[in-house]
Every structure is written in C-alpha cells, then in structure tokens.
C-alpha cells in the first residue's frame, strides 16, 4: 500500500520491481541462474589448471556466460514486452540446442562403448593422435597399447599406422607409433606408415589404398579400427564402404574420456552441420 492507503498502480508496481537491487530481492530463478554462473566460472578456472581437460574448462566458462546473458535478459524483461519476448526466444533456442547436443552425445557414447577387440580382422588401421615433441600423448599412448595387444593376438595381419606431423610435433604420429610398437616386439614388416593425414577423413582415405596393396579386399574384408572410444562415432560416420569395421577402442582415464566425449559431440556438429552451412 502507498501512503494514504492507496494501492499501487501498474506503473508504480513496475518501478518497484525494477528497484529490486539486492540479490535476495531477485526472483528465485534469477538467484539460481546467478549461482550457476558463479559455479561454472569457478569450475572453468579449476579445470583449466588440469592437463588434458582444457575443453571442459572452456565449456564451463561458456555456460557461465550463457547464465549471465539469461540473467540479464530476465532482469530486462520487466521493462517491456520486447525484452520478455527476447528472453523467451533465448530460452527456447537454448533448450533446442541442449536437446540436439544431448542426442548427438548419446549417439557418440553408444558408438564408443562397443568393444569388438576379441573379433578377428583381415587388416588394421591405427589412427594417430597428438605427439609432444617425439613423445606420444596420453591418447596416442593408449592407442599404441591397444594396437600392441591386438596385433599380438592376431599375428598374421598387416597394420597401417596413420597420422602426419602437426605443429609442435618433432615426428609424425605414424612414426611415433611405429617406434613404440617395434620396440615392443611387433614385426616391422607388418607395419605400414601413412604420414600425410591431418584429420580422421584423411586417415581413412589415405590408409585404404596402402592396405589394398597388401591384398586387403575393401569391399568384403573385415577392418579393425584402433582409436579411442570417443572417436568411433566419427569413424563410422566417415566410412562409406561396405567393409565390415571391427571396433577396437583404446581406454583413456575416465576424466580424459569425459572431456573428449564432450568435445567430440561439439566437433561433430561443427564439422557435419555448421561448416557445410557456412561454406
């Protein structure tokens, strides 16, 4: 009630609403959004200090920014219907984005958790990952370990080691795998180096002709693909031949696995949807 016992009018109520300056006078949803922004910001700072999970740190900062934008729109929505409409559009767009990315993430996880390493194959492709100078990264080391186990279990099949030399690498990914596998007793005659590829599409495209020279039937053979689980969905998406693929996933530590699975869903949406639209 206003002085004199008069109830506040609509304009006066609007002015009162906009004067809710303190945190505890905000709507409950606004307080929750502000707390989430702070949590995501602190989480991002913490994750950025850990090796190998940089994407999760950046994603946390991105989520903090989204929360701040939604908070700002929520506060401004009290001023006019235009701001309220913009808030609704942002909320609907965010919900659609989350649902779409969640669907992609479920598909990536399901593809990555199929382990067929006990099944035989006619040939092998080991996909490269980063090299720190001449030392294999954690991801590449796990692929080398998986390749060693599979090649020792199937001693009569050839393998292409696929991966070029990127920035900051003193040797190609293929050569790093070759050196490690031969040091562990794998016959070098079985190993074929493919050192030109810079991405997964090139890995597959450049490796197949090398296997065909060894007698591999790309239209009827069974091809074992060794890479990390998060990578398997992309391999299946890019592979367009009737060759039966045998998935041999290399195991990462759980915290790296979670980071790479998150990153992969965004990368697939970027490569398969956004990039073709913007090209």
Could you tell me what each predicted segment is?
Residues 102-262:
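A structural signal for short, hydrophobic/glycine-enriched beta-strand patches
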């Amino acid at each position: 009630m206003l002085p004199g016992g008069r109830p506040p009018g609509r304009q006066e109520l609007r002015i009162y609403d906009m004067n809710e300056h303190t945190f505890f006078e905000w709507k409950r949803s606004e307080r929750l959004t502000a707390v989430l922004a702070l949590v995501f910001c602190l989480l991002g700072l913490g994750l950025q200090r850990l090796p190998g999970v940089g994407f999760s740190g950046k994603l946390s900062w991105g989520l903090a920014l989204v929360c701040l934008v939604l908070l700002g729109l929520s506060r401004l929505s009290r001023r006019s219907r235009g701001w309220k409409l913009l808030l609704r559009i942002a909320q609907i767009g965010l919900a659609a984005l989350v649902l779409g990315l969640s669907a992609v993430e479920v598909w990536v996880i399901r593809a990555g958790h199929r382990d067929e390493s006990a099944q035989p194959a006619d040939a092998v492709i080991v996909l490269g990952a980063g090299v720190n100078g001449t030392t294999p990264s954690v991801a590449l080391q796990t692929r080398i370990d998986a390749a060693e186990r599979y090649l020792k279990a199937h001693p009569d099949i050839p393998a292409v080691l696929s991966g070029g030399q990127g920035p900051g690498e003193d040797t190609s990914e293929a050569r790093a795998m070759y050196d490690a596998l031969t040091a562990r007793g794998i016959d070098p005659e079985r190993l074929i180096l493919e050192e030109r590829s810079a991405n997964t599409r090139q890995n597959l495209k450049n490796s197949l002709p090398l296997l065909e020279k060894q007698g591999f039937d790309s239209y009827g053979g069974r091809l074992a693909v060794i890479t990390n689980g998060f990578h398997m969905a992309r391999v299946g998406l890019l592979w367009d031949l009737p060759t039966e693929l045998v998935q041999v996933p290399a195991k990462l530590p759980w915290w790296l696995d979670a980071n790479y699975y998150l990153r992969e869903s965004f990368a697939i949406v970027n490569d398969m949807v956004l990039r073709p639209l913007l090209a």
